Amino acid sequence: ANIELSLVVDTTAPVVKNIASSGQIVRGGSAVVAVQAKDMALDNVYISNGTDNFKLFSYLNNDIYVGIIAWPLKNKFFSAQVVAKDKAGNITKYNLPIARNINAPYYRSNIAIKEDFLNGKLNELLAQINQKHLKPFENNVERFVFFNETIRQEDESRILKACSDLNSNISFAEDFHAFMPLKGSKVVGNFGDYRTYFLNKEKISEAVHLGIDVASVKNAPIIASNKGVVLLKSHLGLYGNTLLLYHGFGVSSIYSHMQESYVQVSDEVSVGQELGKTGQTG
């Protein structure tokens, strides 16, 4: 028997066009991207910084995609490239003209660790960590390095996983506001601060601060600046009681060192809603 089939052989790659994007990006910062991607059988479209891939979200119609691309401090290199692939396997790679600014001013801090901290507060913090982590330490320096480096990395991995596990295309960002979680607060610690720790004038550890420390008064209310959904509620070793909120288009916010929180994972929050309270130090 003879079988006749009509087939469409697709050898045409998707067409990608830049609609709008941030003019430049600083190392440690982010940029907004909007592109048009057209194809009769488009399968996937995303943006890469040369190391990491970021999701692009359908906006207004099926041809327009928007999203946020980051240049993490850990990455020395940055190159913005949109990748579009159709169901036939045709791929288009489109480079975006985002200028790189490597001159962002990040602080360097030298922090003296005191024996009182190693014998007091550090013991309290280590006691809150899952017992499977704990092992015999030769001295206080080993204990501090374990907490400052190993536990820090595990915390950051948990936060990244919570963000990456999100499958929802829901956007809450119709009217996006600057983040101001504490009224009447002031910044006491900067993002990207490179911290070197010393004990008796000897360097024992180092770390990059990946948050912004804002201080107010004891047990101050922590307010949601934007609508969102709770992705993570957990006690993390270095971050303490922590909430992670997702706001749409790949943007999340994290709140750490909380005394208490009033929301649960999957809860939707509204602008102005009280998320919880700060701790003893504000």
Protein language model annotation of sequence segments:
Residues I19-V26:
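Short beta-strand segments of immunoglobulin-like
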Residues I3-V15:
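Proline/serine/threonine-rich low-complexity linkers at boundaries of modular beta-sandwich domains
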Residues A1-E4, R27:
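Long, compositionally biased, intrinsically disordered segments
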Residues A13-I19, I222:
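Proline-enriched interdomain boundary motifs that mark the N-terminal boundary
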Residues S30-V32, D43-N190, F198:
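Non-catalytic extracellular/periplasmic "stalk"
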Residues H177-G282:
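Catalytic cores of peptidoglycan-degrading enzymes
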Residues A37-A41:
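Extracellular acidic, Ser/Thr/Pro-rich low-complexity tracts
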Residues G23, A70-P72, E202:
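Outer-membrane beta-barrel proteins
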